[in-house]
Amino acid sequence: LFEWVIENLSKNAVDAMGVDGGQITLHVEETDDRAIVEVSDTGKGIRKKDLRNVFRPGFTTKKRGWGLGLSLAKRIVEEYHHGKIWVKNSEVGKGTTFRIELKKKG
């Protein structure tokens, strides 16, 4: 299921960049107690007023879409992997970074 989360974030990044393209960066880091994954894009960014809703089921800014991808991603990360996912930063016209932190099993 975790692979699906990364796939969904990547597809959203492609959609955010549109036909002009851009860049997607996947950053993976390991610390003593956690694994960190960041998915960044150079897309249109998320408006401040929409940030609190991005993980809400049914919320979408796309013309086509159900608004379920990010809510399912959050559920998978939190309930199945006991981690956290959030928008690390987003700037309209410049892009967005989602961050996932997973605790390492000791």
Where are these regions (language model features)?
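Short conserved segment of the HATPase_c
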Residues: I46-P57
